[in-house]
């Protein structure tokens, strides 16, 4: 059965047809509407999926934010602007005329990455370190989403009670320190205004402050992984995202994790599917795996 998979991100919308063998075809992308209004998103989604819907039998959505009863929510409502409580599932069912499911994008990515692991892995955690920090948890072969869709939002666990205020309202969240946005916000002097990509370039050139910001991010993620190991006893952790997959970053995380006591050690690996993980994970869920 062919699935029309859609990935709704902060900067772009992606859609593709995916068959039961996870082959992707006719991938399309559009920028996410800057206005963040229901009408703008509705029209963008319509333009995105109209050329694809005739060949699909169902729709699967991976979206930023929290998906609760088919509606779009967020820990930081300001991120969604006028899209808070946007009826995501209902909107796509109307546009495509097909049965639709929706899941958080990091949860979807976790499900895709889980299916790429050896069969003896039943418990894994996926962590994406990018503009923000997100995640997904698979326990005994089942994806955890939670009644309210909150499961796996690991970026909003505590890193430093005296740290910066996070967009969710808490103080010292992992995301506020370790994410690309958090690193950029902490940059000072000649690095002020630099984005995470630039910080990694400067760190590679030996810039002391840039190296510290990257190292601090890796250490915070490593400590979070130790907490995750203690909470889930997962067999492995898969790391993705633009920061997580940046050159040398995973090695730093692994080195910091090895400084933790042995019971908190866990195998780390880089994400396999990268920017297709959300599309593939959502399609897998629609193709018979239930939430």
Swiss-Prot record:
Reactions accelerated catalytically: an N-acyl-D-mannosamine + ATP = an N-acyl-D-mannosamine 6-phosphate + ADP + H(+)
As for family, the record states:
Belongs to the ROK (NagC/XylR) family. NanK subfamily.
Q: Which residues bind Zn(2+)?
A: 156, 166, 168, 173
The gene behind this protein is nanK
Q: Name one GO biological process term.
A: N-acetylneuraminate catabolic process
Enzyme Commission number, as recorded? 2.7.1.60
Q: In which pathway does it act?
A: Amino-sugar metabolism; N-acetylneuraminate degradation; D-fructose 6-phosphate from N-acetylneuraminate: step 2/5
| Name of the protein in question | N-acetylmannosamine kinase
Q: Which PANTHER family match?
A: N-ACETYLMANNOSAMINE KINASE, ROK (REPRESSOR, ORF, KINASE) FAMILY
Q: Into which EC class is this enzyme placed?
A: transferase
> What Pfam families is this protein classified in?
ROK
Top-rank taxon: Bacteria
User: What function does this protein fulfil?
Assistant: Catalyzes the phosphorylation of N-acetylmannosamine (ManNAc) to ManNAc-6-P.
**Keyword annotations of the record:** ATP-binding, Carbohydrate metabolism, Kinase, Metal-binding, Nucleotide-binding, Transferase, Zinc
Binding site residues for ATP: 5-12, 132-139
């Amino acid at each position: 059965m062919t699935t029309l998979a859609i990935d709704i991100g902060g900067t772009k919308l992606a859609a593709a047809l995916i068959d039961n063998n996870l082959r992707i075809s006719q991938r399309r992308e559009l920028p996410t509407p800057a206005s963040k209004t229901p009408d703008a998103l509705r029209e963008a989604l319509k333009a995105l999926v109209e050329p694809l819907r005739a060949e699909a039998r169902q729709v699967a959505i991976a979206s930023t934010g929290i998906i609760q009863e088919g509606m779009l929510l967020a820990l930081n409502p300001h991120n969604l602007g006028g899209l808070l409580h946007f009826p995501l599932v209902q909107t796509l069912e109307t546009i495509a005329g097909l049965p639709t499911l929706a899941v958080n994008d990091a949860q979807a990515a976790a499900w895709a990455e889980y299916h790429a692991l050896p069969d003896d892995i039943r418990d894994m955690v996926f962590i994406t370190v990018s503009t923000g920090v997100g995640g997904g948890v698979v326990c005994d072969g089942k994806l955890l989403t939670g009644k309210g869709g909150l499961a796996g939002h690991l970026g909003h666990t505590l890193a430093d009670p005296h740290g910066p205020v996070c967009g969710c309202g808490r103080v010292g969240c992992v995301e506020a320190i370790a994410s690309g946005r958090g690193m950029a916000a902490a940059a000072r002097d000649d690095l002020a205004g630099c984005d995470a990509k630039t910080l990694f370039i400067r760190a590679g050139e030996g810039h002391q402050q840039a190296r510290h910001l990257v190292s601090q991010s890796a250490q915070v993620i490593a400590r979070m992984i130790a907490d995750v190991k203690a909470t889930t006893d997962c067999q492995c952790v898969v790391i993705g995202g633009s920061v997580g997959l940046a050159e040398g970053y995973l090695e730093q995380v692994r080195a910091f994790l090895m400084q933790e006591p042995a019971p908190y050690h866990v195998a780390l690996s880089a994400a396999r599917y990268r920017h297709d993980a959300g599309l593939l994970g959502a399609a897998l869920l629609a193709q018979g795996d239930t939430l």
